Structures are given as structure tokens and as C-alpha cells.
Amino acid sequence: MGQIEWAMWANEQALASGLILITGGIVATAGRFTQWYFGAYSIVAGVLICLLEYPRGKRKKGSTMERCGQKYLTAVVKLFGPLTRNYYVRAVLHLLLSVPAGFLLATILGTVCLAIASVIYLLAAIRGEQWTPIEPKPKERPQVGGTIKQPPTNPPPRPPAEVRKKPSEAEEEAASAGGPQVNPIPVTDEVV
């Protein structure tokens, strides 16, 4: 049985946490809660988390489905090098970002989700995982002339090669001249 790649789960959890923090922050700020500034903080922290977590990391085995537009944010995340590649750093960062948002009821759900993502990232880091970007594969252009020796001469459906017969010269001349063709099946006018 295969080994679980925890970073993939942490990535999804953290991205959802960022969106939940943004939503809770909007509710707290727009609703003019008593401590609305924690809501404003949650919006900023949620946007930062979403920008960091949007690019998926490459899996060790199998293929990784790239998110729409991920390649643009991947270049930005790659610029920070070991700060974004190391999952210990991400675990601590997410845990620290989640603490201030925990003081407001509207953002407590995002706080709990982000703390869970932090624990999952810590588990991924202990298991030796790290973030690697999904690099685009170079496209191989197929050699058109290399696979087809000679194009087919008969229209489909074609009989198997051993059953096909070569047309005689008289038939070829009649076909090219546009003259009448002989029907090999006898036609009768009997009506039953």
C-alpha cells in the first residue's frame, strides 16, 4: 500500500482556511463587530495564505493536476526559495497567522482550520516532504512522416490486405475515363 503524501492534504486544508478567514473577516469588518480590526487582519492573512497555497506542489509519485493559472503564482512562490519550500516554515507561519484571528467569533472557524493545516504541514515536514513546483513538460512534436509509410488508396471501409485485389488495367481505364461501369451483381426486374 502506498504512503500518504500529507503535504497535498495540508495544501487543500490551508487554502480552504484562507478562504474561510477572508469570509469571516469580511463579516466582522462589514458588521462593525466590537473588535473589527481582527476581521481586517483576517482578510489580509487570508489573502496571504491563499496566495501562498494556491500553487500545488508536485507529488512524488503519479501525476499532479495543476490549478488554473497556477504557473503565474508558482513563479512568485519559487522566488522565496527555502522559506516557501520548507514545510516546517509553513507550519509555523500558519500557526502564527491563526492566533490573532482566534479572538473573534466570525473568524474562529478559519483559525481552527488553519491550525489543523499547520499540524498537517508539521506531519508532512517530519516525514521529509517538501514543496517542489510543477514544471511544464516539453511538448514532443510527433514525426508525421515517420509513422505513415504510404497513405491508403481505397476509401473506408477497407477489406483486409490479403483480401484486397488489384484493379486490372481495363477497370482502371474505365474508371478514369468516366465511362460506364459493369455491375458484378446481376439485377433482375422480378417483383414478387
Curated annotation (Swiss-Prot):
* Keywords carried by this UniProt record: Cell membrane, Electron transport, Heme, Iron, Isopeptide bond, Membrane, Metal-binding, NADP, Oxidoreductase, Phosphoprotein, Transmembrane, Transmembrane helix, Transport, Ubl conjugation
The modified positions for Phosphothreonine read T147
What intramembrane ranges does the Swiss-Prot or TrEMBL entry report? Answer: 70-80
Compartments where found? Cell membrane
Task: Give GO terms: molecular function aspect only.
Answer: electron transfer activity; heme binding; metal ion binding; protein heterodimerization activity; SH3 domain binding; superoxide-generating NAD(P)H oxidase activity
Describe its assembly: Component of the phagocyte NADPH oxidase core complex/cytochrome b558 complex, composed of CYBB (heavy chain (beta)) and CYBA (light chain (alpha)). Component of the phagocyte NADPH oxidase complex composed of an obligatory core heterodimer formed by the membrane proteins CYBA and CYBB and the cytosolic regulatory subunits NCF1/p47-phox, NCF2/p67-phox, NCF4/p40-phox and the small GTPase RAC1 or RAC2. Interacts with NCF1 (via SH3 domain). Interacts with SH3PXD2A. Interacts with DUOX1, DUOX2 and TPO. Interacts with NOX4; this interaction mediates superoxide generation.
Give the family this protein belongs to, as stated in its UniProt record: Belongs to the p22phox family.
What's this protein's name? Cytochrome b-245 light chain
Q: Which organism is it from?
A: Rattus norvegicus (Rat)
